[in-house]
Amino acid sequence: MLNQRKPVEQMTEAEAAEELAFLAAELSRHDMLYHGKDDPEISDADYDALKRRNDLIEERFPALIREDSPSQKVGAAPSLTFAPVVHARPMLSLDNSFSDEDARAFVAGIYRFLGRLPDGSIAFTVEPKIDGLSMSLRYENRRLVTAATRGDGTTGENVTANVRTIGMIPQRLPAEAPDVVEIRGEIYMAKSDFAALNAEMAAQGRPLYVNPRNTASGSLRQLDAKVTASRRLRFFAYAWGEMSAMPADTQLGMVETFKAWGFPVNPLMQRFFSADELLEHYHHIERERPELDYDIDGVVYKVDQLDLQARLGFRSRSPRWATAHKFPAERAFTRLKGIDIQVGRTGALTPVARLEPITVGGVVVTNATLHNEDYIRGIGNTGEPIREGRDIRIGDMVIVQRAGDVIPQIVDVVMDERPEGTEPYRFPTSCPICGSHAVRDINEKTGKVDAVRRCTGGFVCRAQAVEHLKHFVSRNAFDIEGLGSKQIEFFFESEDETLRIRTAPDIFTLERRQESSLTKLENIDGFGKVSVRKLYEAINARRSIGLHRFIYALGIRHVGETTAKLLARSYGTYEHFGAAMTEAGGFSGDAWNELNSIDGIGEVVARAIVEFYKEPRNLKVLSDLLEEVTPERAEMPVATDSPVAGKTVVFTGSLEKMTRDEAKAKAESLGAKVAGSVSKKTDIVVAGPGAGSKLDKARELGLQTMDEDEWLALIGG
């Protein structure tokens, strides 16, 4: 399934929403296998690839972030075997960096967020990222009282009895330690101890353990603490939770204090002031990795000064002041057997490489993305050469990588092994499904040619029509039980007019058409009286449907589930929405401006919606559909206790007590929506020195305006 995923840059918002739902469920399952059962099905690299895929989609479609997204939670729910422990401070995970460029961007982002010039004045620590089990050790009056796993980040498992058997973890702290101390770190099994344990298992004729990480985790969760004691587990301290007093004001100072208190800390941890120095140490640790007696999968960069950490704060699941720079994922060589072209619901022609099977990162790969025709030709998104201009041809020996994305990708070609007589791949200029012209649109604003070639057949194209119907009945749209992919394809291909479904309204006329038909659905293989009755009941149950589901089901390009909810909340009723979209047809005037002013609706999305409503075929389908179904009035959001919750805020001019990023993060944490432009939908404009046209427009519209001090007073500082 993963090999078939579309490149993120080619996804529509609807496709992105569908995949984010899949990734939320899939990553939750793997979290439970990894954290809860110590029995992972996939490698760490593949897990990181899934998470990175999720992050990339959310980065491109921020309005689609789900409440159950892996980016909004940490780890997995604790098991029922051990008593639950609620962490005094959440145990958050880290954002990942996958390249030197990502690491440099992290450093640059710190300076930018703090409003400082990148002058090398900010110190960062670098330390190996231990591949073990995260642990929180709580000391009260300098005695170890609780040891808990990370769990889901909020609630972990009480494994105190087992942790007491680990000799290098102090049971008591020295007199200078504060009354309440939570030390956080990683429990792991040394490679040498793991090898010795497996040697013992082999001598006894018992199954061998898979890897040190799983063995350490399983050893810690033994019901018999004597088993844990026999496994020679170890610990590195590197962070903290609740502290009744802070013994240092830097990250490095805290870790040095832990060492003085008797905790083992990693000797490779160092402090630097530039991205170049961070990366030099990263590559040094990477070279030393094979010689280390413990598994690591990257390094961690942290801002050293604790007061700067406090200013930088947190995202929903991770600190803004730290990142994990992962080591590169595995690459492999294989032969490109062919290139298939897939046609999606929006007509996008996507090339997929068919490969001789090869194992990459522990997974057998037979397909890989080729992104688009320019990528095949050796041209990047902005027109620059990639792979030094080397094109990809059928028959080539190619390099396949799984890193930073779920889809395996071809990253290069081995020119020395290119067979004689190969020819450059000719990307089709007609749809392989319906034969219609396939074109690359020109962006009216930039004048650039779209990287994606699209079929112009619209509903004439079977692939687009079928995929559109599948989208219409999908879970987040009309959610009609009994109309899955196979059933949609059957009804679409039927030659019987009483069975045929070619557009959405046909779904709701099926039962009426069948009443006078000689070809009864219940007599067709795969159906029966009971299943047909249930199908009709499911269809009729959807004759009244939420407005956001109705809008989402239309399959408008760039309009995913979250965008549909924004539109529904903004317009309230379909009558208002439909009339406004028709009125906005000239891409100007009040209706057009109102659409563009909705926070989360940019011009690209707005133009796609209006274009949809200008197409006569779409209007005919809509008219027929509205004869059969009734979109319900949208529910309006409930306000919270925050004085700015649900309000749209615009910051303009210079801010003197915080950076723009800090102000935005604070406003969003209080439930406000931050917009970049002023409109009738704006509630508050915060204006600092140098405020210009935005402040003028706010006054012209009679909006509430305030300066930075008034804003801070409103939100409580």
Curated annotation (Swiss-Prot):
Zn(2+) binds at residues 431, 434, 455, 461. Residues 639-717 form the BRCT domain. GO terms for molecular function: DNA binding; DNA ligase (NAD+) activity; metal ion binding. The keyword Cytoplasm does not apply. The lineage of its organism: Bacteria, Pseudomonadati, Pseudomonadota, Alphaproteobacteria, Hyphomicrobiales. This is DNA ligase. DNA ligase that catalyzes the formation of phosphodiester linkages between 5'-phosphoryl and 3'-hydroxyl groups in double-stranded DNA using NAD as a coenzyme and as the energy source for the reaction. It is essential for DNA replication and repair of damaged DNA. The active site is at 129 (n6-amp-lysine intermediate). Pfam families: BRCT, DNA_ligase_aden, DNA_ligase_OB, HHH_2. HAMAP family: DNA_ligase_A. GO terms for cellular component: cytosol. It comes from the Bacteria. Keywords: DNA damage, DNA repair, DNA replication, Ligase, Magnesium, Manganese, Metal-binding, NAD, Zinc. Coiled coil: none annotated. GO terms for biological process: DNA repair; DNA replication. Its cofactor is Mg(2+); Mn(2+).
